[in-house]
Amino acid sequence: MTFTLGPRAISAGYRLEAFEQVGSTNLEAMARAREGDRGSIWFVTAEQIAGKGRRQRPWISPRGNLACSVLELLNVAPAVAATIGFAAGLATEAALRKVSLEAALRAGPEAFKYELKWPNDVLVAGKKLVGISLDAEAVDNHLAIVAGIGINVVAAPEETPTPAISLAALGVQIGAEELFSALSDSWVEFRGIWDNGRGFGQIRKLWLERATGLGRTVGIKSAGSTVEGTFETIDEQGCMIVHTPAGRLMPITAGDVYFGSAASAGAV
């Protein structure tokens, strides 16, 4: 496989490190940060064999799927840096829309309605197509943030908490290389809108326009406790706001999210 950055990413000064096989692109990126790298660099691999997603779940990416990570060095508080995950979701959704335009025209727009699931997934018809994982670490006088993005291009894992789907199953015939190039360009756009957190208000608006589950029953499981209610919105810090049966608006900072009929079952 030959991965290349998109023209917009190149113009913005991004660099690329590509591998045939690697344990984890996130680990490679964070190791580079510890070595003093200045950031604005992508790590991409044809095959990932020991990756970890959210909550340290295994994240294996076979050849043909896309596994990549971008390293940014920031001078912001950790809580602000965490909101870059919403920019990553928007960038991924935009890249997917671009590369699947031809298939969408054949099948109709509803067949390719990509939706963003809090905090960092991209779904199609309720099935997981993309997972995004954020890692952060203080390095010298900066905060190193790594956004790892995994996309099911040719194959989807089985027996996952959320049913998964691939682009191939949707009829989108695209290579991981072309998708990566589009993603690197759209990252520049949404990273710029986010603007070290100053533009999160606009990111939040765009994210909510593409969000799944708004107004629906939701169950969130985290650290052995569960919360159930209605998904109202996300706040200015990126927390999920849940309207509980007791009438309370509860901010949720992390957890496994289940919607609709799966809310109660998933929260057990």
Where are these predicted regions, by residue range?
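N-terminal lobe of the biotin/lipoate ligase/transferase fold
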Residues: 1-113, 249-250, 265-268
